[in-house]
Amino acid sequence: MSYAELFCQSNFSFLTGASHAEELVLQAAFYRYHAIAITDECSVAGVVKAHATIEQHKLDIKQIVGSMFWLNEECQIVLLCPCRKAYAEMCRIITNARRRSEKGSYQLSEWDLMSIRHCLVLWLPTHQASDHYWGRWLNQHHNNRLWVAIQRHLGGDDDAYTNHCEKLAHELQQPITACGGVLMHTAERLPLQHILTAIKHGCSVDQLGFERLSNAERALRPLNKLVRIYKPEWLEESKYIADLCEFKLSDLKYEYPTELIPNGYTPNSYLRMLVEQGKERRFPEGVPEDINQTIENELRLIEDLKYHYYFLTIHDIVMFAKQQGILYQGRGSAANSVVCYCLEITAVDPRQISVLFERFISKERKEPPDIDVDFEHERREEVIQYIYKKYGRERAALAATVISYRFKSAVREVGKALGIEETQLDFFIKNVNRRDRSQGWQAQIIELGLQPESLKGQQFIQLVNEIIGFPRHLSQHVGGFVISSGPLYELVPVENAAMEDRTIIQWDKDDLESLELLKVDVLALGMLNAIRKCFQLIEKHHQRSLSIAEITRRQDDPHVYRMLQKADTVGVFQIESRAQMSMLPRLKPACYYDLVIQIAIVRPGPIQGDMVHPFLKRRNGEEPVSYPSEAVKSVLERTMGVPIFQEQVIKLAMVAAGFSGGEADQLRRAMASWKKNGDLAKFKPKLLNGMQERGYDLAFAERIFEQICGFGEYGFPESHSASFAVLAYCSAWLKYYYPAEFYTALLNSQPMGFYSPSQLVQDARRHGVEVLPICVNHSYYQHHLIQRPNGRLGVQLGFRLVKGFNEEGATRLVERRPKTGYHSIQEVKQILRSRRDIELLASANAFQILSGNRYNARWAAMDSLSDLPLFHHIEEPSVGYQVQPSEYESLIEDYASTGLSLNRHPITLLEEAGILPRFTRMKQLVDKEHKSLVTVAGVVTGRQSPGTAAGVTFFTLEDDTGNINVVVWSATARAQKQAYLTSKILMVKGILEREGEVIHVIAGKLIDCTHYLSNLQSKSRDFH
C-alpha cells in the first residue's frame, strides 16, 4: 500500500504547525510515503526548505507544492500544483490575498478561486450546514479537478464526519482522497502544538478548551496505521493525485530584467562596452596586461553562465546613486572581480589584493554571484524607491527574513502558556547571562529558582528548547531585492511588509540560494552617511571638495598610521572595538594592506585557527618565516606564511592539494556550515591525500586542516576586509585632519558604531575640539559647527539630543527664531505652544542663556497661565527660582535629559566628595608595572562578549582621563553576577597586564558604585 500526504502544515503556518518542514519530509521518507505536500496557510514559505532537505539527503520521496486557504471562514481548501502554470496561478492567488490585507493576514475572494484553471483542488468539509453550499459552488467551478478530502483523527465524531463527507462526495459525483491534516512530524510534538495554540489565542494551555487537540493523530502516521484508518481506495487516490503533480521547484527558472540594453547592443556587447569604458577611467596610465587578461577571463565566464544581465542591473543601480550624490560601496566577494571594479561597483583596486574570481563566480558552484552594495543609511530609501519605480511592484520585492523564537521570546511565550507568573519569567530573562542564552541557560534558570523535578519545570525546559528556532513571522531582509523580467508573483508570492511602501516575497536568502535565484543586496551603512556629512561640512567651512577616492588614492599618510598604532580609533570604521584597539599597537599597521589584515585578524576564524600569535611573532621578527614550497609561498607570502583570509584557504586547497576552483569553493561553503552540518569531514581525506601526493608531510597537512576548521568558526574574506579597509582609512584620515567635522558628522549619524554620543563628545574634547551645550538661541536640530574666538571650529550640540523633543518642534523653533535670538522663555512658549516641550528644553538647560540655570527655566515653564491663549499677553513673572543647582544636580539632569554632560566627569565629582576609595586613573596606568595590583573606577560605557572569547567579557570603563579596558573572566562574572550585569559606575580591583603599548586590567573584584550616583541615566552599549 502506498500513500501521499496531501495536506501538511509546517511551522510556517505560524502558531499552528509544530514541526519544521525539514523534519516533516525526513519523517515522511522514513515512513516510506510516496509523496508529501507542504501546504502552509496562504504561503509557500516552507516549501524550499523541504526541497533542499530532499536534495541534500537524496530522499526517495516526491515533494508536492501547495497551499491551504480559508474562504469566508467556512470553506477550507488545499491547492496543489500539477504543473508550472498551476504554480504561477497559486502564487498569484496567494499574492492577491496577502496584498489586499494587512501584514500577517490574508483575504481570499470567491473570484480568486473562480479564476483557477490549472491547480488541483482538495475540499475539506467542515461538518457544518454550509458545506452543501460550498460543495455545489466548488463543483460548479472546478468539476474536473476537485476532490473531497477526508481527515480522520480518531475523535469522537470521526464516523459521523466521514459519513457526512461520503454523502457530499456522492452528491457531487467527486472522488474521495485520504489526507492527514498534519501539524507535526511525530506525536511527541503534541505538547508544543498546544503551546503554539495557546500563544495564538493569548491564553494558557489549561484555558484552551475545545481549541486544544484531543490527541496526537495530526502527526505523520506510519502506513500500517493508515491502512486501518482509511479505505484502500482513498489511500490509492492520494497516490494518483500525487502522480498528477509533476511540478518541481527545480523547474523554476529566473529571468533577468532585459530593458537595460540599448538598441544595437546584445547583453554581452553592452557589458563589454561598459567595462572597456570603465577600465580606461580606473587605469588612466594604461591597463596592465595581467589585468586585461583577467578581465577577458571574467567576461568569458560571465557570458558562459549568462550573468551579464545581473551585472548590468547592479551597474544601473549604482550609477543612479552616483548621479544622485549618494555614497555607496560594493563589498564582499564582488571585490574579487576586476569587472566589478571597472563598472565602479567596488572601490578596491585588484592590484592591492589577491584576486580570486572563483570566490565570486564559479562554473562548479551552483549558485548565482552575490554582490553586496552599501549605501548611505539615510539615503538608501531613495535607491529602494528607484528600483520599485523602474521595475514596478509586480517585478521587484525584498527578500524575506525569518524572525524566529530566541531565548527571550521563547521563555516569555512558553512560560505564559504554561501559566508561569510573568514576574518570574522576567526575572529569568533578566538574570540569565546573555552569552549563555544559546547554550547552558537551563542550569542558570534552575539556579534562579525553577523546580526541575516538577512536571511544569520539565515541560518548560523541554518546550523552550523545542520552540527556539521556530519561525514567528516573516520580516523584510535588510536589503536583498529580487527583480524579475516578468511578474514576480509568478515566481514566488509577494506580500505586504510592515513598513509602508515595501513588499516582500515569501522566501529568505537561503531559499533563493537553494533555488539558484538572484538577489540584489541594497544595504545601508551608517559610516557612509557620516562620511558624506563630513564631506559636506568640510566643503562648507573650508571650500574643499573631497571624495573617498581622493582620500584613499595613496593611503600612505604616516600621521594617520601613527594615530592608528596608538589605538586612537574611537569612531573609526571597523577598528574601534576594544578587541581591535588592543590589536592595533601590536600589529602597528603602516600601509593599506596592513589595515586589510588588521580588520580580518580580529575575527573568530584566525583566532580559533591559532593564527594570530604566529603572525605577530613573524611580523615582529621573533619567529622565522618559512614555506614548505614555492606554491604555498605564492599564497601566503603577503601574510608571512600564516593564512588570515578565506581566499588563502581556498587557494591552498587548489595549489597544495589539487582542488579545482569549484571544489575549493565547495570547501568554503562547507567551512561556513561545518558546525551545523559537519560537512568539512568529507573534504579531509581529499585534502590530506592531495597534499601528501604533492610532497607535503602529514603534519603540515593536518595543521592546514585544523586551520580550515578554525576558519569554519568565521573566516573573513580578504575581499570583504579590503572593502572595509577603504572606509577605515578614509574615516581615520578625516578624524586626524578634520576632527571637529568628523565628530559632528558622527553625532549627526547616530545611532551607529560602538560609542554613544556621550563617549564621542568626551573623545572629541580629548582631541581639542570645543563642544558647546544645547542653546535655544544657537542650536539647530542637528549638531553644527561654529567659529570660535580662537579661530577654530567648535561643535554646537543640537536639539536632537534632547530626549522626547521631536524634529518638528525644533524646526519650528529655529525657523521663527529672531536674528537677535529669543529674549525670554515666554517668546519660545508662544512658538512651541507646548508646556511639555518647554519643560524638556528646560531640563536640558537649553534656556541657560535666558534664565541663568535650569531651575529658573523650569519655574518659568510651570507658569500655567501662558498655556492658555487668553493669557498670552500677560508678561512672565520676574521672580525666578533663586537657588542654584549644584554641580552634582546638574550632572544628573544632564544625563537624564540628553544622555551626556559637558560638566566635570562623574568620577571627578565622586572623588572630590570623598565618596570613592583611592583608585588609579587611566593616564596613570602607563606608569604601572606588568602584573601589578591596581584599582580602577569609571562609568561603564560598554560590555562586549565576543563569541570566540571563551566566556570573556570586555568592559570599557571611562574615567575623567580616558577609557580603561577591563577583562572579566566567566568565573568572576558568575561569582559577582549583580555587579557584572547591572553596574553603571564600577570599581575594579585586579591585575594590570601589559603587552607593548596595550594595557588592560584582569578583573578580580567588581564593586558596584552606582548607588553613589543612583539617578545617573548613562547607558552602556552592550554587544554580544
Swiss-Prot record:
EC number: 2.7.7.7
Chief location category: cytoplasm
One Gene Ontology cellular component: cytoplasm
GO terms, molecular function: 3'-5' exonuclease activity; DNA-directed DNA polymerase activity; nucleic acid binding
Entry's localization field: Cytoplasm
Disulphide connectivity of cysteines: none
UniProtKB keywords: Cytoplasm, DNA damage, DNA repair, DNA replication, DNA-directed DNA polymerase, Nucleotidyltransferase, Transferase
Example GO BP: DNA replication
Xref: SMART domains: POLIIIAc
Coiled-coil features, chain-numbered ranges: none
Reactions this protein catalyses: DNA(n) + a 2'-deoxyribonucleoside 5'-triphosphate = DNA(n+1) + diphosphate
Pfam (any one): PHP
Family: Belongs to the DNA polymerase type-C family. DnaE2 subfamily.
NCBIfam families named in the record: polc, PRK05672.1
Cited function: DNA polymerase involved in damage-induced mutagenesis and translesion synthesis (TLS). It is not the major replicative DNA polymerase.
Annotated protein name in UniProt: Error-prone DNA polymerase
Lineage: Bacteria, Pseudomonadati, Pseudomonadota, Gammaproteobacteria, Vibrionales
